[in-house]
Amino acid sequence: MGGMKADSPGTIFSVPYEIAVVRPLRQTTLGDRDDALRAAHYNTELIPQDLIYIDLCTDSGVSSLSTSQLSALAGPKFAEPGMGLAPEGSRAYALLSEQIRQSFGFPYVVATTQGRSAERIWTKINIKPDTVVAGNMLFPSTRNHIELNGAKIIDVITESAHDLASSDPFKGNVDLEKLAAAIEQHGAEKISCIYVELCVNACGGQPVSLANLKAVRTLATAHKIPFFLDASRILENSFLVKERERGYHDRRLREIVSETCAAADACTMSALKDLLVSSGGLLLTRDRGSYQKASMQAFIDGVQLPGVAMELLVTSLDDIFASESTMANRVGQVNYLWHRLSDGVPLVKPAGGHAVFLDVRAFLPHLSPEQFPAEALAAFIYHMSGVRLTKGPPAAPSQARRGLELLRLAIPARKYLRGHMDDVTEAVLYAYAHRHEIKGLKRVEDSARSKYDPAHFRQP
């Protein structure tokens, strides 16, 4: 987030966009929010959208659209027969493929309706039963798809990822000694792949350095192990590499993205995060045979991305790479909120790429895990302010074993202004000042049929 400098007013550029369309918000009372919490069984995920002031539940698929994206939606430039099915011979697909080659360096792309579809197809093709996948605290959907194919996941993330107070700038890095030990223990032939998530959500949106990616590439090549990336947050990761890694401060974002991809054999990604669209997933590969299998599987599963959505994705990539200020503003807003809260409130350090994470155990030390402290804190903050937080994806197994519990403040791109972040700051600071008044919750038995169903809670 830029600021005015008296000696160089030409640097003033805090917000790289102006507001073209607005959605009025309803101002709720304390009583309204009390009723909403009761109706939602104290689960903030279940609160209706019109009763929320600032929604930090997720940044996925809820970013504001640019005027160029709206133009693409209003009248596709490349409309043609069959565009709704997005055949790979269409102009929309050709345009997307060319953008992917230029920006990411992969010759083959399969565009799907969402990231988990791309993951499901890719793991089905590449992950074999009774094998091992080495990863760095992978996202729950990635873990699920790997395990559904009968493989075991070994976490080889750096130890600093488990130290919430550590200021290590690259807590998403792979521990190369752990990785080498896993290869030696299981044998390279038993390892289906090395799978690395960029800007690891589970440990606070923490990036992976390019030096680390290149070292992983060297190990993978030496042992003939495929190396894949979850590149859903590749732009955030690349921006943080530009800010934190020596030798990249003057590099263009597109160059860092390309160099990141050059380390991998393939990537899967959700387009709903960094690519600032509301639908779409990508599977990028260098291997024609794998591409053909994946393309056929996408057709069979009925998850091919429609042509209009492809065009919207191309337009978004054009916008992002034309002006790095979009990503600077996105990461800068997270950094601003983190710094506003960092003086006293227990947070994951350092600031991540897409969200601020509260250390729930340190925030509410008087509540045991059985009292659902993260859910209780989210309910309290909503009750007092109308700001919605949710616990987010389940903790990684290595975090659960250590008793770590985080509450995520995910900031959608181009949606909120500094005033909103100041209001969030006030809400969290109020909760922290009154933390000893926050009481735990009890789970209503059988309220959730599976771990993906929203649970119901009640106050004791």
Enumerate the language-model features and the residues they cover.
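Glycine- and acidic
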Residues: 82, 106-107, 322-323, 409-413
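Conserved C-terminal alpha-helix-loop-beta "cap" of PLP-dependent enzymes
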Residues: 5-19, 26, 301-302, 335-449, ...
